[in-house]
């Protein structure tokens, strides 16, 4: 059972001038916003990941791998010292 949904066909939307005026501005702005989000370091702060120079400290040069899931909180505290 097929019917008409009343929506505009995709070919009409993509070939309209209005579509390209709007998207020629918004799509590049999304890329620029993403680039700024990462390049300024805000992504590290928002998601809580260490910056590339913070993975290893002078005191700890080994990989911070959690060995026991029941003692994970204590191990993470040790890694952060």
From Swiss-Prot:
* One Pfam family hit: Cytochrom_B559
Any one GO molecular function term? heme binding
SUPFAM superfamilies according to UniProt: Cytochrome b559 subunits
Q: Where are the transmembrane segments?
A: 21-35
Q: How does it assemble?
A: Heterodimer of an alpha subunit and a beta subunit. PSII is composed of 1 copy each of membrane proteins PsbA, PsbB, PsbC, PsbD, PsbE, PsbF, PsbH, PsbI, PsbJ, PsbK, PsbL, PsbM, PsbT, PsbX, PsbY, PsbZ, Psb30/Ycf12, peripheral proteins PsbO, CyanoQ (PsbQ), PsbU, PsbV and a large number of cofactors. It forms dimeric complexes.
Query: Which family does the entry's similarity section mention?
Result: Belongs to the PsbE/PsbF family.
Q: What is this protein called?
A: Cytochrome b559 subunit alpha
Question: What InterPro entries does its record include?
Answer: PSII_cyt_b559_asu, PSII_cyt_b559_asu_sf, PSII_cyt_b559_CS, PSII_cyt_b559_N, PSII_cytb559_asu_lum
Q: What does this protein do?
A: This b-type cytochrome is tightly associated with the reaction center of photosystem II (PSII). PSII is a light-driven water:plastoquinone oxidoreductase that uses light energy to abstract electrons from H(2)O, generating O(2) and a proton gradient subsequently used for ATP formation. It consists of a core antenna complex that captures photons, and an electron transfer chain that converts photonic excitation into a charge separation.
Topology in membrane: Single-pass membrane protein
The UniProt keywords, alphabetically, are:
Electron transport, Heme, Iron, Membrane, Metal-binding, Photosynthesis, Photosystem II, Thylakoid, Transmembrane, Transmembrane helix, Transport
Q: Tell me, what is an example of a GO biological process annotation in this record?
A: photosynthetic electron transport chain
Name the needed cofactors: heme b
Annotated binding of heme, by residue: 23
Write out the annotated subcellular location: Cellular thylakoid membrane
State how the cofactor is bound: With its partner (PsbF) binds heme. PSII binds additional chlorophylls, carotenoids and specific lipids.
Q: Name one GO cellular component term.
A: photosystem II reaction center
């Amino acid at each position: 059972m097929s019917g008409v949904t009343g929506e505009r066909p995709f070919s009409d939307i993509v070939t309209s001038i209005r579509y390209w005026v709007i998207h020629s501005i918004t799509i590049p702005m999304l890329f620029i916003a993403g680039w700024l989000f990462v390049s300024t370091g805000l992504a590290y702060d928002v998601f809580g990941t260490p910056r590339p120079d913070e993975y290893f400290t002078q005191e700890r040069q080994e990989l911070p791998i959690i060995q026991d899931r029941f003692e994970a909180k204590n191990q993470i505290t040790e890694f952060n010292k």
